[in-house]
Amino acid sequence: MVGEMDKPLVSVVMATYNEPEKYLKESIESIXNQTXKDFXFIIVLDNPNNKKAEEIIKEYQQKDKRIIFIKNERNLGRGASRNKAVNIARGKYIAILDADDIALPKRLEKQFKYMENNRDIDLLFSWVYFIDENGNILKEFKPEKYKFKEIKKYFFKEHLTVHPSMMVKSKILKKLKYDEKLIRSQDYDFWIRCIANDYKFDIIEEFLLKYRIPNRDNYLSRIKKQKLYSYYTLKTHWKNKKHFCNNVYFWKVFFYSLVVYLFIVLTPTFILKILIDIKDKKTEISTKGH
């Protein structure tokens, strides 16, 4: 571990592996240039062979002593990497950022003030801009505030939370941690366990994050990703089922994911490719229509 840290108000946690240099620099700079200055920025490099990323992080660290750098000796995965940062995080709150996303300048200031003024809130999110590889805004993500007050109902009905927009009480993340056995969906699993523990969610109805959507993968990669996503959704739900026995929305997501997973496993690849092509064409037509 490299760097020093007093007790800041907020610790920012970032895990990086092989994100493009441009994205990594933009992400680091977005934290260093926050209007709120009292924070520590813990960056974990999960690829010990990525010498360029190490060089970039150390260059920023020389200019900003708030940056704490950890290099894993081997690839541990995002969950374990984030947990290493969480273990040394200090202060009342932890903010998450991924190494290809951008925190808008007042993110930490506004989230910290909101948490301080609403002490009953445990996890706080924000509105998000979805951006492309060049930083162009693709979509605005604006979930309604009232849905966070009924999180047990709406969390399983629709997409409400974007992980790198989260600020959470340190004691909660240190207690629950990310499940390191999950390759995917560690954030989803963490949120389900927070809901099971009756922690309170909320959202600031302001845009405080730019969330990067990568270029569209080829169809084989997309099939693999959807298969993995469905599998780990099933695994996460099954693991936490005792807390949601009577939650009909929880079980709807479970059975929907089961159907999707079985469909992908049992359907010939060439048919899946045809269905993906049809979906892409519909998306193009819809986009042109707007």
UniProtKB/Swiss-Prot annotation:
Homology family: Belongs to the glycosyltransferase 2 family.
The superkingdom listed in its UniProt entry is: Archaea
Q: Name one GO biological process term.
A: biosynthetic process
Q: Known InterPro entries for this protein?
A: Glyco_trans_2-like (IPR001173), Nucleotide-diphossugar_trans (IPR029044)
Q: Which GO terms describe its molecular function?
A: hexosyltransferase activity
Q: Is Transferase one of the keywords?
A: yes
- Give the protein's recorded name: Uncharacterized glycosyltransferase MJ1057
Q: What is its EC number?
A: 2.4.-.-
Query: Which terms are listed as keywords in the entry?
Result: Glycosyltransferase, Transferase
